[in-house]
């Protein structure tokens, strides 16, 4: 049985050019990496490790990080640390896969508030989004799972189940579908399906139960997540539950993205985009700007954060950028959150949505 080695090297010429660009800025410039935060200590440790990996590639540039909620340091602490080092301009990037509520509203709200109070210039980058480097990193995780399982079942007889976070933002949810299609077609697998860990539909269990009915001999469950945490653990628990009910199908778990070198390179590219003025998020399907089907009542909601009261809480049972929204985000959370006053998700009662959660799975 073979193991796939990940030996991608970020081009030294790219790293050198990026650092020179940052150091050549007229104002002392630093980098802020903005994470969501989690009650899971493993997730917090993995984000910290990734942030430090980014910093290691830019040794002469001040780099800090912080979390929106449930973990420390909070974002404001990281920004103050940069200011204390004499930084006058901050390149801030969201440590998130897609632009849903946190990347569009909560983080910009925190950054804008700090900038207004401190006078610090903060330029905000975009999410990791759909990117060829991210797809290659994801494909490595899937190929690792296939190679660890052995060659007893062909790719033609394999179904790939990509599990996304799930959001009340239909644009972010649709991106998971695109990731799945690019992996399915690129790897030449027999079939591809999508599920979500929460908020929207289908959730993991109904998605896997549907996949079994399609008759493939192998099902690979791939959490399209950056880090471990409560949700990834829950995804694997549902995977195990459905697998136990169908012993005639081979169920394989793929690892999440974590600190794959191509993920780190994508983050570094987001910094370059800010310097080049190319850091606009995709507004074409933004539910706060356009009449997105089913979400028409959310257009134009005010931009604000609902997470101030959970900043730094890690034991709870708890700018300026080209994509300037004038709206608040709206999402429903099934975990990792205190209750926030959010706009309700319009399909929360869908038969394959949150009401299918197994209360016995934490």
Regions found by a protein language model. Give the residues of each.
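Active-site-proximal alpha-helix that buttresses catalytic centers in soluble enzyme cores
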Residues: 1-362
